[in-house]
Every structure is written in structure tokens, then in C-alpha cells.
Amino acid sequence: MLRLEFDGLFRNTDNEHTSAGIMCYGWRILRGKQVVAHGHGTFARGQNANSNIAEYLALVEGLEALLDMGVNHERVLVCGDAKSVISQMQGQASVSSPAVRPLYTRALRLARHFSKLRWQWLPRKHNRGADLLSRHALKHLWHDPDLYQSIIDRLHQAARSGLANRLLDMGGLRVYQSA
């Protein structure tokens, strides 16, 4: 059985109490106790950025990695510490946020490719592997002031162009390891 663990985090980028921000994600895929793939990355958005979107970005990236691995017919357990995301993906809760709905729909479409997929909520302390990856993406930004400033500049440019609601992909990494 494969296990996908995912996590996202959000950081506001300004002092005006808007919802502009940086959303980092991390995910890893395990076969037993062996990590066979992992990834992390960053998106930014000039408005409507939040931690739920970061969680969905992590989920979507992880599901896409599973598809890339061609494991559609294997048993897959998807685990995350965001109760709302797990409940929504299980059909137990609705998605009310228009900002989240497109990512939810995308995650649903990806999940339908797997014939034996189950969902499980994890307490945060049991999702440390994915959490460390999302934090690694954030640390990468903090340690590179030029990169961070370029993100802020792109957010301001998007806002001036009327595209503040667009997700800006600031880069990511996927690593696949042979089992």
C-alpha cells in the first residue's frame, strides 16, 4: 500500500491585513516505511490566499505525483492534518469558499483516477514528514531575500494588472526514488 502525506502553510505578505500571501506545500509518498517520492514548493496570491488553499495545493501536487508514478490501481491512503480538507474530500463537508472550490474540484478529478483510495485525518504531530517539507519551502524563501522580493514584486504587478486572484507558481521540486 502507498501512503500520501500532505501539508500546507500560509504566510501573509503585507501589513494591510489583506489576504495576499505565500502558500508553501509539502508532500511525500511512502511504500511501507520507505519514502519513494517527495516534493515541496511555493505559490503566491495577491488576494484570497489562505491555509486551506495551501493544503489543497499540497494535496493536488501529491496526487499528481502518484499519477506520474502510474500507481492508479494500487491501494492508496491519503493523509493530512487539515480536517476540513479530509472531510471535504470524503464528501462529509461542503466547500463554501469560491477561492478553494477550483482546487477542490481538481483534487476530486485527480482522486477519481485511483480505484482503491482512502482518506485519513492525522493529528499534526503525526504529519511531521510533510510538515517539514512545507517548512523547507518557506525557509528557502526566507534565506533568499532576492527571491522573496521577486515574489512581492510579482504580487504587486499582478494586483496592478487586475490579476491578484491568480495563483503564481514560485517553483517546486519533485523527487522520485526507486523502490
Positions of predicted regions on the chain:
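RNase H-like nuclease fold core
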Residues: M1-I53, A65-M69, S178
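RNase H catalytic domain
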Residues: L9-E16, V60-R135, H140
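Alpha-helix boundary/interfacial micro-motifs
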Residues: C24, P98-V100, T105, H140-W142, ...
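Intrinsic disorder/low-complexity segments enriched in polar/charged and small flexible residues
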Residues: I29, W121-P123, D144
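Low-complexity, flexible helical/coil segments
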Residues: A37-F43, A65, R112-L117, D153-R160
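Short, mixed-charge aromatic SLiMs
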Residues: N48, K83-Q88, L155-L163
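Catalytic phosphate/metal-binding cores of nucleic-acid and nucleotide-processing enzymes, i.e., regions
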Residues: Y56
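Acidic two-metal-ion nuclease catalytic site recognized across multiple nuclease folds
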Residues: P145-A179
